Amino acid sequence: MDTGVVPEKKSRVSSDRRKEKSRDAARCRRGKESEVFYELAQELPLPHSVTSNLDKASIMRLAISYLHMRNLLSTDNEEEQEEREMDSQLNGSYLKAIEGFLMVLSEDGDMIYLSENVNKCLGLAQIDLTGLSVFEYTHPCDHEELREMLVHRTGTSKKSKEPNTERSFFLRMKCTLTNRGRTVNVKSATWKVLHCSDHVRVHESPAEQIPGGHKEPSVPYLVLVCDPIPHPSNIEAPLDTKTFLSRHTLDMKFTYCDERITELMGYDPEDLLNRSVYEYYHALDSDHLMKTHHNLFAKGQVSTGQYRMLAKRGGFVWVETQATVIYNNKNSQPQCVVCVNYVLSGIEEEKMMLSLEQTEDMRPVKKELEEEESSEPEVSPVLLKEEKSPELDVIKLFTRAVETQPLSSLYDRLKEEPEALTLLAPAAGDTIISLDFSSPDSDILQKEVPLYKDVMLPSTSDKLALPLSLLPPSDQHLVPNTSVDTTEVSTGPDSSSTPGSHSFTEPDSPLDFCFPMESDINAEFKLDMVETLFAINPEPKTPFTLQAMEDLDLEMLAPYIPMDDDFQLRTLSPEEPLSCGPAQPLECSSLCSSVRLTQEVHSYPGSPFNAPGSLTASPALAASPALAAPEPADSPCPASLLTKTVPQMDREISLRSLASQNAQRKRKMSLSQAVGIGGLLQDHPGPGKKLKVSELSHADAPFNRTILLLPTDLASRLLGISSEGSGSPFTLPQLTRYDCEVNAPVGGRQLLLQGEELLSALDQVN
């Protein structure tokens, strides 16, 4: 029986028909979907070349993004929706103006919009990123910070009624562009730092409410302008004059700075080296910059935004900096920080001092002003009254100015009294006013002696110094560069009438003992004066009181201590007045004539150290009457002439001047030529006295000479005046055992104790 076979065939045919119908229905359905997606793609604001190649998923995400953007941009005001002509013209320039690209994020982090120039910054197409989540293309370490930026917190507290909608942060996104401009796969992409800044924009629901009575919640959108930070090695455009480069260590200390900072801010590049950049930040911007530097070392690049940087001489300038961390190619460790600094303004508030660095330049100016104020002479009220009077007495003006300012110059007085200049130069026919220089005030000014000055400085005293006797004519062949004119001391009319008056005053420093000489030995002689003839003046130096030498206890006075040489300190005893026979009255003709300070008595040929009164003469010559030339009894001694006209201290000055001249001659000539005798040792009479004696080298020498090589601190005692049983008006000082053992030469001048050796020897003796 064939009854069971036929139903099986019918069931197979029906199932195949159903499947075919199902495939046809699905195919029709897919066709309709494709038509719908095609129509939907045509509605997207994209070119046809782009939309024709989109898949359904891309069309859907692009459509959703478009709807979000429409929702964000929709407003109730129809007037604002009308696009103006100016806006249409500027729309094409907005993207060119910004260096980066525009990105709009939804509350969930979806990129609902990106501008077309994102491809130039990241190498990714706009269509490939729109509608996707931003977390898929950002660095995992930045996700938490990004979520915080997406959250829109409404102001619930009373203090903040309006929430802060501004955002500024740094985001690392994938970049498929290489340094050469090529595009790589997304899997091989690198991280690029973007400075994202803008605000949160909230879309409010329309006024109508849902039938249930609930209002739709507001939808926040994060609108960002993403600016990439260029690497310093990839900067193509040349930097302008308002931009300077700097390199820093990892603790932000300067290691290099461009020279253009000098014109912009006043700093020299050398002044900034090894200095922290935080020293030059405005205090109000320090916190912001510190956070920025944290981002720098965490993400590799940063842009500081606008901040204030201090100028050198006061004030500040607005600066924006793009900083980049440079990594080592071998171990990928950070090495340094390179900054591109853009100066946005000039120096503002220049007079405002904001740090101690800015006040250093002001200190010299303040000191200058203080010195100028202190140097201005004070005019007494009497002088002020004299100025108001129509006629000025020039003599009283100068004498009173001397009382108020004894050290002021004539120029300073005339500058303070300009009306006196008209009286100093009278017109034709006027009576010439004679200035009286014999007033008591001028005598007081000459008697006053200023304090000790620095021996290394030239004297600035205007007082008279005694002229010095130069070499005799017989010694001209020894020192050819020295002037051979004999300098004489002439007495004025005042000194002839009043023998007790002071015709000369003492110089301020030992350098005033110098005499005119050639320029080639002038500097050398001044140095020799400092080294060999520096001695403490026995007269007390004070501008306030004048006392006689015999009334002072010099052991109680503090001597002048030089700071640059090792001089032996000792006290000086008061000197006896000079006696050289009975003083004879001076005639007017002798007073007007010149008196020679040195005499050539039994002179050895060619030797300036041969006079009995010479400081370096032999004791045998001074003590033996047979060797010394007899002096006429009626001829007055030069020292007695000085006692008639010059005080005791003025005589000592002339003797020091002679010693300074002889010291220069010894410096220019050899010792044997200056003395003219050979070396010969001879003991000086007296216990404990050891002297260095030279011996005659010539066979016809009639006598021996003793040369004393003493330390410079004995110069004042060598110049001392005494009359104790000596045929010569000058006697040699009494040398102690201490002086001879420490300072006497033992084998030539090269074996003298110098510097530290002399100090150690003094310490052992003490």
From Swiss-Prot:
Contains two independent C-terminal transactivation domains, NTAD and CTAD, which function synergistically. Their transcriptional activity is repressed by an intervening inhibitory domain (ID). A motif (Nuclear localization signal) lies at residues 718-721. This is Hypoxia-inducible factor 1-alpha. The gene is hif1a. Residues 1-26, 361-383, 475-509 are annotated as: Disordered. Keywords: Activator, Cytoplasm, DNA-binding, Hydroxylation, Nucleus, Repeat, Transcription, Transcription regulation, Ubl conjugation. The modification (3S)-3-hydroxyasparagine is found at residue 743. It is found in: Cytoplasm; Nucleus; Nucleus speckle. Its main location: cytoplasm. Efficient DNA binding requires heterodimerization of an alpha and a beta/ARNT subunit. GO terms for biological process: cellular response to hypoxia; intracellular glucose homeostasis. Residues 17-70 form the bHLH domain. Induced by reactive oxygen species (ROS). Residues 82-159, 230-300 form the PAS domain. GO terms for molecular function: DNA-binding transcription factor activity; DNA-binding transcription factor activity, RNA polymerase II-specific; protein dimerization activity; RNA polymerase II transcription regulatory region sequence-specific DNA binding. Residues 7-26 have a biased composition (Basic and acidic residues). The keyword Repeat applies. The modification 4-hydroxyproline is found at residues 426, 559.
